[in-house]
Regions:
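Pre-Walker A-like glycine/lysine-rich segment at the N-terminus of P-loop NTPase domains
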Residues: 1-45, 56-62
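Hydrophobic positions in the central parallel beta-sheet of the AAA+
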Residues: 3, 310-312
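Phosphate-coordinating catalytic segments in nucleotide- and nucleic-acid-processing enzymes
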Residues: 43-307
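A broad, structure-centric signal for solvent-exposed, well-ordered loop/edge residues
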Residues: 12, 25, 31, 199, ...
């Protein structure tokens, strides 16, 4: 894959070939982190974007239902996630006031006027491309801390990935962006920006604190927590991912074992690094070992898959 940046952060222009393990070298403060952040943002903003758009619409839909149930003093009941999402995905951008009103009144104890439903339908029928552009811009803006553009340039910023002879491009302005997509992004990216995020696995009520993390750190820890929770709830979950990982990522696992010689032990909800019969709380292992512990957890829980992007 060829990854190209123009007028982004500290970078005027960059053309990088990503093939297997790619090492980017350079002096301090010349834009190496900008490349990593751009790659992370590009993949995660565009990966499975149709589902993300449907989730945005689903959230608006649920808020509408709850506000009308509350306003009519009807006891609130749990929303049927599968039902609302199925309805939204089946309609795409072709919602009608009549169909939405019918669905609401048949599935929930509410009565709504056509005028109220019309305002909801306006949101639901927003073009996919407009929603995607807004989502991608916000994601880049968040990761880049509000400084996407090269401050020494007045031109448009752009990020392009050329994959399988096709290209996906994001054109970025100060307050908006435009996505031109030829090839779907089918893999996630993970950025181990700070090895000390490993400590969050052993914090009480960690989910509550995740919002305080930057997107890169939150992305890694959230994925590990979710995958492990799925395994804890159902020991038969993630079997396919685990089998594929063991088969196709075996070489990586062998290399990892040279640095991460021990094993991970989970006891009473806490993670430990176990070596020579001694268990060390993840929070007490060295910074270097923490990075390898994160990779080990991502592999063993099926988070990190073949062709996913791992940025260190």
């Amino acid at each position: 894959m060829d990854f190209k940046l123009k007028d982004l952060g500290k970078i005027k222009k960059a053309d990088i070939k990503l093939d297997g393990i790619t090492v980017i070298c350079g002096d301090n403060n010349t834009g190496k982190s900008t490349i990593g952040k751009s790659l992370f943002s590009f993949y995660n903003a565009l990966y499975d974007y149709k589902t993300k758009i449907s989730m945005q619409k689903d959230s608006r839909f649920k808020n509408f239902i709850l506000s009308n149930i509350n306003s009519m003093d009807v006891p609130v009941r749990l929303l049927d996630n599968d039902s609302t999402m199925s309805f939204i995905t089946s309609q795409a951008e072709d919602f009608s006031v009549e169909d939405v009103k019918k669905y609401l009144e048949e599935n929930y104890p509410i009565k709504v006027t056509k005028n109220k439903v019309a305002s909801l339908v306006e949101y639901l029928n927003l073009p996919e491309k407009d929603i995607l552009n807004e989502y991608v811009f916000r994601y880049f803006n968040l990761v880049m801390n509000g400084q996407i553009k090269n401050l020494n340039s007045t031109g448009k910023s752009s990020v392009t990935a050329e994959i399988k002879g096709k290209s996906d491009t994001i054109l970025l302005n100060k307050k908006s962006c435009s996505c031109e997509l030829d090839e779907p992004i089918e893999h996630s990216a993970y950025y181990i920006n700070n090895p000390f995020v490993l400590d969050w696995l052993n914090l009480t009520n960690v989910s509550w604190f995740l919002s305080a993390l930057n997107p890169m750190d939150r992305n890694v820890i959230s994925a590990i927590i979710k995958a492990q929770a799925d395994i804890n709830e159902d020991s038969m979950s993630n079997i396919l991912e685990t089998v594929i990982n063991k088969k196709e990522l075996d070489e990586i696992r062998k290399v990892l074992k040279r640095a991460y010689a021990g094993d991970t032990v989970i006891s009473h909800g806490k993670y430990y690094y176990s070596e020579n019969g001694v268990d060390f709380d993840f929070r007490n292992i060295s910074a270097g070992l923490k990075s390898f512990a994160l990779i080990e957890r991502m592999l063993e829980t099926g988070v990190l898959k073949k062709k996913d992007i791992l940025i260190l």
